[in-house]
Amino acid sequence: MFLTRSKLKINFILLYLLLIFLNSIPFKHLFAEDIYIGVASNFLTPMKALKENFENINDGQIFISSGSSGSLYSQIINGAPLDIFLSADQNQPKKLEKTAKAIKGTRFTYATGKLVVYSTKKFLFGQSFPQFLTSNKINYIGIGNPEYVPYGRAAIEVLKSLKVIKEISPKLVLGKSVNQVFLMSFFGNLDLGFVSKADFLSNNEKGKIWEIPQNLYSPIKQDAILLKNGEKKNNAILFLKFLSSVRTKEDLKRFGYVFD
């Protein structure tokens, strides 16, 4: 069936407009590749800064899904379409590495976190750690649920090292993530919380923190791993290289992370 002259003219105009539109887009943007990253809650604010830096020099967008390391692990096992997993520990990525959900040989430590005690209660500001932990004035002490929150497990280590775990157990409030513990402390719902130093440095530094000696808990090494969904995504591989770069490590030091 032959097209009429008017239909040919319309088709030509539409094709011409399409070519103009495509010509207005830089060639590389036509093939921009988005990636999806599961991020432990303690690393959310630094990750937002890294996302901006990465997107400024690469095409495509980064979409972030945040939560506790344990909950993100469960989501990945159950088919969540993530390309990269940034955990707050080494255990979850190691377990994933033994499954078909992750790419073996891609796991590495991207940062080591610092555990601190945090409070906005002024009556504590002149007190010393760890003496105030057993004070009668303190009723609520927050930690991340040690079942699936790495910073919560570190907090339990500290309390056991100090031999106060039995005494203060009735005062413990378990958060779903270390970030939730920080927020409950930030708004005064807790007398104090065991949180990531990054959360404090990322939130205007309201209140006060007490540094915890490193010999009281195991180093909180945070591992990244490439997931099966991201295996063939160039941007996923580029991001992991970006994450391990010297410049990124310098940026992360501002958030309280340390490096070997």
Please report, for each region that a protein language model flagged, where it lies by residue:
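Sec/Tat signal peptide C-region and signal peptidase I cleavage site
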Residues: 26-32
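N-terminal secretory signal peptides that target proteins for export/translocation
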Residues: 1-8
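Exported/periplasmic ABC-transporter solute-binding proteins
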Residues: 32-57, 63-65, 70, 74-80, ...
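Active-site acidic carboxylates
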Residues: 105
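Hydrophobic H-region at the start of alpha-helical membrane spans
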Residues: 11-14, 71
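Bacterial N-terminal signal peptides
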Residues: 13-26
